[in-house]
Amino acid sequence: MSGMVTQVRPRGRDDSDAHVRIGALAPLTRPGWHEAGRHLLAGMELAVREVNDAGGIAGRPLELVVRDTAADPGRAAAAVDELARLGVAALAGEYHSVVARAAASRADALGLPFLCSSAVLDALTERRTPWVARLPAAQSRGWRIYADFLLAAGHRRIAVVAQPSLYWTSGARILRDRLAARDGTLVALDLPEPDPAPVCDALAEQDASALLLLVGIPEPAVSIVRSVRRDRRLAGTLIGAPAGQPEFASWAAALAGDGAAIPFLRYLPERLGPLGARVGAALRERLAEAPSFVAFEGYDTVAVLAGVLRSHGVGRPLTAETWAQVSAEGTRGRSRFSRAPGATVWQWLDAPVQVVDRDPAEPGRFRVLHTG
């Protein structure tokens, strides 16, 4: 299997046998959302460098072994097998939920610890496992918060266009159930290909006050936004993108002002503390642009795993109590893990969730609209 390997080591240390290795999974090429993967990897690499500058893991340097998953579940599962053969102490990363699910299932089967950085799909594994934990809020929590935001803003009839995917289907179901419980309605619109323009006709016919985009970026998301913005019948219609597409610089570059005022979920606290501010500045320098919440997730993932490896030891099997004992200070707060009722993986239950958008007056600035 092809992939890239990134080694982050302290200056003057080059004894490869002494390294503690973490396998890092990220979408770095298309059809994966490679912009998200680049931010995720930047956060992980920065954290590894800081861990090594502070002495590593019991004096041993930490090293990332990176594999590009390219939004391919089969490729991710193969990467987990390969990384296990290479002797990594744990796995980290992944952005795409369906890909993370494949990686988590394989890690569980192999007994390899995996801390998922960014994927939110609730059912990361089919069975209860001690091996897998997750940093971001589960989809059922985040998307309910998004539905609550829509209801609080006065939206009761909401349209959605969705591409075929377990992730999008799960998200639509969460939204529909939450809205229905509060007298709201979610109406599914067809998504014609290759021209999404007929979405505007269907939206006008449904008399919905909002349209949610459960679709990929750049296309068809960019074309749909442009079509809706230019249709006079739809003036005042809210466009929403709960999966976070407007977070990244490519969204603003493609849509400029048309991409503003589109609420999305963002997994950051309302204000970063001193650690978050310092890491944010370092990430901005590393990325040559504002870091997304995904970059902070990458940093925090390695920070948590480094703490686990220091306290629990390298090469010792995890027990059901290992994740429960974690208490790691990260850029977005202190991470502690527990199991939600019915959950199969360990979860940071208090992970921050916001609904934000880009300010129409200044699209490079984000406005916090709602917190959960």
Which residue stretches match the model-derived regions?
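Extracytosolic ligand-binding ectodomains
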Residues: 1-372
